[in-house]
Design a protein with these regions (language model features):
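Nucleotide/phosphate-binding catalytic cleft detector across ATP-hydrolyzing
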Residues: 1-107, 116-232, 239-265
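Short acidic, Gly/Ser-rich segments with clustered Asp/Glu that frequently serve as metal-coordination loops
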Residues: 109-111
Length: 265
């Protein structure tokens, strides 16, 4: 989506079918889902596929019905909804069916989802609309204020991936970034450091941590003790931000582990 957002000069209008974890454009979402179905399931005139769609916790009944509606409009026979945190936990290999507490934090593009699970169900869950997209905007705003230069969402995302970090380590990285000077209107290249990106993302990362803390505070004591012992598991694209596990661990006092394949959980 970030690459698509940067093609405005070609007279192409880029849209985000989903925003903050919910449907923003019904028609575009339907076409997107149809494309996924066509790529993964062989077409048949005799049968329609059954699909399972992961949804954020905390969405409204109206938003749930909108998701189901898109699923049926895309040509499916049955649509089943499941919470993203449950899918992420299973994908991360957590034993969610056992009589003990496990905690998953899924930091995606539009939302960060966190939950404590036990006996195959969700005991406590929270969701905030601060995740990868928000971090990209944080970087854009930081560059605008510090350098008086505007950069695109694609550049901001690449900066986050390449040199972004939640805490500083011994080796600080640098990256040349192309943008447009707000003073002259001309192209300009600036140099961003890991420290710049850390500072840009800090406030949003703190908000994610505060939501994790809130989830733990709402967790029954015996399950919270399990989480304290076994740790918190992180999934989603933003789980790959350098030192994010150390940052969350330092703020919560709990061991933090990154899922083996966080982007595909």
């Amino acid at each position: 989506s970030s690459a698509a957002s940067d093609v405005y000069k070609r007279q192409i209008i880029a849209v985000r079918p989903l925003k903050d974890g919910v449907i923003a454009d019904f028609s575009a979402t339907r076409m997107l889902m149809q494309t996924f179905i066509e790529k993964t399931i062989q077409k048949s005139i005799f049968s329609k596929p059954r699909v399972i769609i992961a949804i954020p916790c905390g969405i409204t009944d109206v938003e749930e019905r909108a998701v189901e509606g898109v699923g049926y409009k895309a040509g499916t026979k049955d649509v089943y909804l499941i919470e993203e945190v449950m899918v992420a936990a299973i994908g991360a290999g957590l034993k969610v069916d056992r009589p003990e507490g496990v905690m998953i934090v899924d930091i995606g593009g539009g939302t960060s989802e966190m939950a404590v699970l036990s006996l195959g169900g969700i005991v406590v869950e929270n969701s905030i609309k601060i995740a990868g997209n928000r971090l990209d905007l944080d970087i854009i705003e930081y560059v605008k204020k510090k350098f008086n230069v505007i950069i695109g969402e694609g550049e901001a995302e690449e900066v986050k991936k390449q040199i972004g970090a939640a805490t500083l380590s011994m080796a600080e990285e640098k990256m040349n970034v192309k943008g447009r000077s707000l003073a002259t209107g001309l192209p300009e290249v600036i140099v961003l450091t890991t420290a710049d990106v850390k500072d840009a993302m800090q406030d949003s990362l703190i908000k994610i941590v505060n939501s994790i803390k809130q989830t733990l505070e709402e967790t029954p004591p015996e399950l919270a003790a399990d989480v304290m012992e076994k740790g918190i598991y992180i999934s989603g694209g933003c789980a790959q931000i350098k030192n994010l596990d150390r940052f969350i661990s330092a703020e919560t006092g709990i061991p933090v582990f990154i899922a083996e394949d966080p982007t595909n959980c």
